[in-house]
Curated annotation (Swiss-Prot):
Keyword Ribonucleoprotein: no
Reaction(s) the record says it catalyses: GTP + ATP = guanosine 3'-diphosphate 5'-triphosphate + AMP
One biological process term in Gene Ontology: response to starvation
Limits of the ACT domain: 685-757
This protein's pathway: Purine metabolism; ppGpp biosynthesis; ppGpp from GTP: step 1/2
Protein known as: GTP pyrophosphokinase
Domain (TGS) ranges: 406-467
Gene for this chain: relA
Phylogenetic placement of the source organism: Bacteria, Pseudomonadati, Myxococcota, Myxococcia, Myxococcales
């Protein structure tokens, strides 16, 4: 870019050369800002032109076009001059020789901080080792952290992505599909959560065009077929509403529009219908002067046309979490077709279009999110999740389920409103109130009637949770709860229960082992000797070590080896009273010792099979042992596992949390581990609860194919309530592949739950 010339050092730029022609003028904020600093915007324009000089975009246009367009979008959002300047400079640190120090000197620390924040969202410290999905997940985590620090960073990023999507034609098809899918998964839902509806709509339609081009252009062609006829219909209907408002002495601006392409596509897919069966592709909007006049206009509309029962929504009384307010009603319109009508005030319309930007833009200093502002409760929830969920992919999946799905609004018995993902159950509602309420939930009343815990709540339901001190979460709840909060709390409780059982089992095994050497377990515990042994085995406290013994990660012999005097160990070995010579363990408590009874199992296995097993599991480092897998839990490589000697059958392998395994005599437990040297596949059965719609089974099987997973058996049946239960036995390489597969299926439209059985 600069050739052999160094970039400009920190200096004063002469803004007199600023081009004032309309097509090159950077966005002005004069029309909406009471006292804008236009000089800094002009200065940023000149600087951006200088440092980007000679750079071209894929389209062949000068690179400067991009920052100008980004700044223009930020101007449409009516943001402050610092945001506009950031839009002009957002690529300077990443793509030129400009530095943060230079930007600080020229434009101040606020702008430099914003530009640096946008730059960091695009950088990965270990990009070479990350998959595209992992990059996307990590990038989203960064966005949430940046958003909590200064919301303008995300608004600039949204503007940047919007212009990039507008010019995506010049990318390769592979990049088009990847960028569009990411936009559909993350940026469009994020714009919706921030309340910026026009960006959300544009990003969805642009993404749809590149993710599913055939469907996009086919649907667009159908919409264009009767476009002029529909435009005339919109004009006539608007005139009719205006005249009726005037007759009543009501003021209001009336407009009509086509619903955007992607929203129509989603309705076709979710309802399993054809385009010809979609009757509400047109919507009308009335902008009234006050909230009370909105309800007056609603009454007039319902007098003119019959409302469709169950299709009225009052978002004025109960705003959406993204601050959206409006009255929604669906009526049987002039041509006997369904038509949606939205009624709101001009202030509500402004918030619907600008969203979060409408609430902070002229406040002094940083646009930092207030911890006390209820409008940002969802963002505070995101911050908590990103701290709790260390895996970026798990964090992203959590957000997609809990925050980026459609919502239902339900009431507590006191009249408080709770927003939950569509498909949420009373158990999700209980955990949304408090973890203790969820843990003790025994039932629920919806609108005064007892309902099953699996009941899917609807808009306007009043939900009362019934609790009992004796109740505790059931593993079965995981098959139907929707929210990640409920899933985490249920898993946490079950894990704690398993820990307590393993702790008790570990104490019994340790006590039994120490008694062989006439040692008292409790005395060693009180004396501190047990603590020393735990630390020596790589644990912080005694309980962690005992839990590991209960799980089978550490053997009782490894403990006795550290507590029993050597002469006693030698005597026991010489006398044949000790079954094994405990070996030294590695740090972390995962040993590789020869276990009690292993030689007998090995001899038995050799007689039975006479060769190495092909199970993918090692028994105490020995390969040639007959191994079976518990059908109750069907472990796959990657699952924590435990082995149990089964007379006449070698060793049976279970997952460590399997209830059958926990109930097995601990004396029969042996140390097992997955053999990482080979590629071993295991059958797993998945139960997928779905809507009963055409094409959904094909979507699921296509997912198996894309993930490289073979189906060995399948059983699909309709349940008679517009649902279907689909059971698949699939061949899985490891736990990571299984988890990824289940999460992908869960994201399919019409899938309610995916369960491993």
């Amino acid at each position: 870019m600069w050739g052999n010339v160094a970039p400009p050092l920190v200096q004063s730029y002469d803004c007199s050369s600023f081009d004032d022609s309309p097509e090159r003028h950077p966005p002005t904020v004069s029309q909406y800002h009471p006292d804008p600093d236009l000089d800094i915007i002009k200065k940023a324009y000149v600087y951006s032109a200088k440092v980007h000089q000679g750079q071209l975009r894929k389209s062949g246009e000068p690179y400067l076009v991009h920052p100008l367009e980004v700044a223009g979008i930020l101007g449409e959002l009516k943001l402050d001059e610092a945001s506009i300047v950031t839009g002009l400079l957002h690529d300077t640190i990443e793509d030129t020789l400009a530095t943060e120090e230079e930007l600080t000197e020229l434009f101040g620390s606020e702008v430099a901080h914003l530009v640096d924040g946008v730059t960091k969202l695009s950088k990965f410290s270990a990009s070479a080792s990350l998959s595209q999905e992992e990059k996307q997940a990590e990038n989203f985590r960064k966005m949430i952290i940046a958003m909590a620090q200064d919301i303008r960073v995300i608004l600039v990023k949204l503007a940047d992505r919007t212009h990039n999507m507008r010019t995506l034609d010049h990318m390769s098809e592979e990049k088009q599909a990847r960028i569009a899918q990411e936009t559909l998964d993350i940026y469009a839902p994020l714009a919706n959560r921030l309340g910026i509806s026009w960006i959300k709509t544009e990003l969805e339609d642009l993404s749809f065009r590149y993710v599913k081009p055939q469907e996009f252009f086919a649907l667009q062609a159908k919409l264009n077929k009767r476009k002029k006829e529909r435009e005339k219909y919109i004009e006539d209907t608007c005139d009719l509403i205006r005249s009726k408002l005037a007759e009543r002495g009501l003021k209001g601006e009336v407009s009509g529009r086509f619903k955007h392409v992607y929203s129509i596509y989603k309705k076709i897919k979710s309802q399993g219908i054809d385009f010809d069966q979609i009757h509400d592709i047109i919507a009308f909007r009335i902008i009234a002067p006050t909230a009370p006049s909105c309800y007056e206009a609603l009454g007039l509309v319902h007098e003119m046309w019959k409302p469709v029962p169950g299709r009225f929504k009052d978002f004025i009384a109960i705003p959406k979490p993204n601050m959206y307010q409006s009255l929604h009603t669906t009526i049987i319109g002039p041509l006997s077709e369904r038509v949606e009508v939205q009624i709101r005030t001009s202030e509500m319309h402004k918030i619907a279009e600008e969203g979060i930007a409408a609430h902070w833009k002229y406040k002094e200093g940083k646009a930092v999110i207030s911890k006390d502002d209820e409008k940002f409760a969802w963002l505070r929830q995101l911050m908590e999740w990103q701290q709790d969920l260390k895996d970026p992919k798990e964090f992203l999946e959590t957000v997609k389920v809990d925050l980026f799905t459609d919502e239902v609004f339900v009431f507590t018995p006191k009249g408080d409103v709770r927003s939950l993902p569509r498909g949420a159950t009373p158990v999700d509602f209980a955990y949304a109130i408090h973890s203790d309420v969820g843990n003790r939930c025994v039932g629920a009343k919806v609108n005064g009637k007892i309902v099953p815990l699996r009941y899917k709540m609807k808009n306007g339901d009043t939900v009362e949770v019934l609790t009992s001190p004796q109740q505790h979460p059931s593993k079965d709840w995981l098959t139907f709860v929707k929210t990640s909060r409920a899933q985490q709390r249920i898993r946490g409780f079950i894990k704690q229960q398993q820990r307590e059982k393993s702790l008790q089992l570990g104490r019994e095994l340790a006590d039994r082992e120490l008694k062989r050497f006439q040692l008292n377990f409790n005395r060693l515990l009180k004396s501190g000797e047990m603590k020393k042994a735990a630390v020596d085995l790589g644990f912080r406290v005694e309980d962690d070590m005992l839990v590991a013994i209960g799980y089978g990660k550490v053997t009782p012999q490894q403990l006795s080896h550290r507590l029993v005097p050597q002469e006693k160990l030698n005597a026991a070995e010489a006398g044949g009273r000790a079954d094994a010579n405990p070996a030294a363990t590695t740090s972390g408590g995962a040993g590789n010792s020869v276990l009690p009874g292993l030689s007998r199992v090995t001899d038995l296995a050799k007689r039975l099979v006479g060769r190495s097993n092909r199970s993918g599991v090692q028994i105490g480092g020995v390969d040639d042992v007959l191994v079976r897998f518990g059908r109750c839990c069907n472990p796959v490589p990657g699952d924590p596992i435990a082995g149990f000697i089964t007379r006449g059958r070698g060793v049976t392998v279970h997952t460590v949390g399997c209830e059958k395994a926990l109930a097995t005599d601990p004396e029969r437990r042996v140390d097992v581990s997955w053999d990482v040297r080979g590629d071993f596949k295991r059958p797993v059965t998945l139960r997928v609860l779905t809507a009963d719609r055409p094409g959904l089974l094909a979507d699921i099987t296509n997912t198996f194919s894309k993930k490289g997973v073979n189906i060995s058996q399948a059983n699909c049946r309709a349940t008679g309530d517009d649902r279907a239960v689909n059971t698949f036995e699939v061949i899985i390489s490891d736990l990571k592949q299984l988890t990824d597969l289940m999460r992908t299926i869960e994201r399919l439209q019409g899938v309610y739950s995916v369960e491993r059985i």
